[in-house]
From Swiss-Prot:
This is ADIPOR-like receptor IZH4. The gene is IZH4. GO terms for molecular function: signaling receptor activity. Residues 1-38 are annotated as: Disordered. Pfam families: HlyIII (PF03006).
């Protein structure tokens, strides 16, 4: 009897187990189908979740701080681009402010905004280690450096030679030619593959050529530095050059971690990467302050340009 009951019950158990297995397989298939449907429907959100996870795993504090610096710089330059000329520049000298002043300030602020935004995107991409896009954004960051350098020189040239149109045209064409040569070295990958020292020498040499030729011409034309000080703030430009040289030294020597033999991967506000970009972004806005001072000097002097005025 015992054996018969066991034999009779065994098919029932087999049927129940097969039913459970079939239900389990159906459940897993339905779950997989539901997951695939959800991923197909919300594909961008799925990518965003992966991006957030990748950012948490690979982000560094230094790159986050640098990206934050340029994000704040882009926001500030955008606000200045929208409001500064209309609410401060024109009311300061309403009868003598020209359309050229308006264009000069907005042209420089636009380049500062592009510079900060491109560097923000580059360091954000670098922070999450998207290697397939990193090289392209590195090129864009170098191009934005050249754009900012050339625009800063052209804008200060206007206030240096506002009554010498020939010199302004010649040096503006020269700055554009130097910028095109720099573009060639950047776009042909000759600069990206070079070392940190060679990159620094490249940018310093471009800066020296762009600054020295107009200043020497102005000193000869205006009979010394005293007359030159009536047009631009020479002391402020000197401090700007000192800041750029200090940033270059920090970039090459990796100061201060190299001096104190600290771990190069150690992160903090006093890391060389953070200090370098803080100085570079700070000099961009400091040059904007120099332009304001030069604008005040020009419109406060007797030699005011007779161009299109906003108020007659």
């Amino acid at each position: 009897m015992v054996s018969l009951t066991t034999i009779e019950q065994s098919p029932v158990k087999c049927e129940t187990t097969t039913e459970k297995e079939s239900n389990d397989t159906r459940g897993t298939d339905s779950n997989e189908n539901a997951e695939t449907k959800e991923t197909k429907k919300g594909f961008p959100f799925h990518d965003l979740a992966k991006l957030q996870k990748q950012y948490k795993n690979k982000s560094s504090r230094n790159e986050s701080l640098v990206a934050l610096i340029y994000l704040l710089g882009s926001m500030l330059s955008f606000c200045l681009l929208i409001f500064f000329t209309d609410f401060y520049l024109i009311p300061l000298f309403p009868t003598t402010t020209t359309m050229t002043d308006y264009i000069v300030f907005n042209f420089y602020l636009l380049n500062v905004f592009v510079f900060c935004m491109v560097h923000f995107i580059y360091h954000f991409v670098k922070n999450i280690s998207l290697q397939q896009h990193l090289e392209h954004w590195q090129k864009f960051s170098y191009l934005s450096n050249i754009n900012l350098l050339i625009s800063s020189q052209i804008t200060i040239l206007y206030y240096l030679f506002y009554d010498y149109v020939f010199f302004f045209k010649i040096f503006t064409l020269l700055m554009n030619f130097i910028g095109l040569v720099a573009y060639f070295f950047i776009l042909t990958d000759k600069l990206i593959s070079s070392k940190r020292f060679n990159k620094t020498v490249f940018f310093i040499s471009v800066s020296v050529v762009c600054c020295s030729l107009p200043l020497l011409t102005a000193i000869i034309t205006f009979d010394g530095l005293e007359n030159l000080k009536e047009r631009i703030k020479v002391n402020a430009i000197t401090w700007e050059l000192v800041a750029l040289v200090a940033a270059s030294i920090i970039y090459v020597t990796r100061f201060p971690e190299s001096l104190f033999r600290r771990n190069k991967k150690e992160e903090g506000w006093n890391h060389s990467e953070y200090l370098f970009h803080l100085l570079i972004s700070g000099t961009a806005f400091y040059h904007f302050f120099i332009l304001i001072q030069s604008y005040i000097l020009m419109h406060s002097s007797l030699n005011q340009p007779e161009l299109i005025n906003f108020k007659s």
